[in-house]
Regions:
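Membrane-interfacial, low-structure loops and terminal tails that flank and connect transmembrane helices
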Residues: 1-18
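Short hydrophobic/aromatic helix or loop-helix immediately within or flanking a transmembrane segment
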Residues: 77-109
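Transmembrane signal-anchor helices characteristic of membrane glycosylation enzymes that use polyprenol
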Residues: 14-76
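Transmembrane-helix signature of polytopic, membrane-embedded enzymes
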Residues: 130-154
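Loop-to-helix entry region of an early transmembrane alpha helix in multi-pass inner-membrane enzymes
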Residues: 102-128
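Membrane-water interface at transmembrane helix exits
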Residues: 38-42, 96, 100, 131-139
């Protein structure tokens, strides 16, 4: 793979001029949603402990979602069912290493911030790609693409998926 094709791959992530207003608003929405979860669980989930699994499972209370990602990023074990999600545990190894470095530097468990950053990236670019599919593949107008994207991310389950530490948006 030469450097030109590598640059074209990263060009996919460049936010186009017509996408910027929607991208700005939705980024602020995603940031606000993630901030709500961080504010709610900061005091509970940032102290260091030996048994993260029990802490996260017993204290996390958003119905229908589980905090296994927090547990895996805090203490990298086979928290995920590797038969159902064979790559997900390995995908979380690098965030686990980053968290271990941040624990060493700060003295607190930064899993909620790391997972939030991953989810923010995934939610933001899923919104961008949905807009592009509507606009460039389906061929609808800019206004209709914006409305369809906002409508899609207005569903409660989609909004929850962008803010809870489950694996749905990742």
């Amino acid at each position: 793979m030469n450097s030109n094709s590598l640059l074209s791959a990263f060009r996919l992530f460049r936010v186009k001029r017509e996408e910027r207003p929607l991208a700005t608003v939705m980024l602020l929405v995603f940031l606000a949603l993630d901030a709500l979860v961080i504010c709610k669980y900061y005091d509970v989930f940032t102290p260091q402990t030996t048994y993260y699994w029990h802490l996260f499972i017993s204290k996390f209370h958003i119905s229908g979602f589980d905090p296994i990602t927090y547990s895996v990023v805090s203490n990298w074990t086979a928290g995920y069912n590797v038969y159902r999600h064979p790559l997900l545990a390995f995908f979380m190894y690098v965030p686990y290493l980053i968290n271990q470095g941040l624990i060493w530097l700060t003295g607190i468990n930064c899993a909620i911030f790391i997972v939030s950053a991953i989810q923010l990236f995934a939610a933001f670019y899923s919104m961008i790609f949905l807009y592009r599919i509507c606009r460039e593949v389906v061929g609808v107008s800019r206004t209709d693409s914006t409305l369809a994207t906002v409508f899609y991310f207005g569903f409660a389950f989609i909004m929850l998926s962008t803010m809870v530490p489950d694996h749905f948006v990742i």
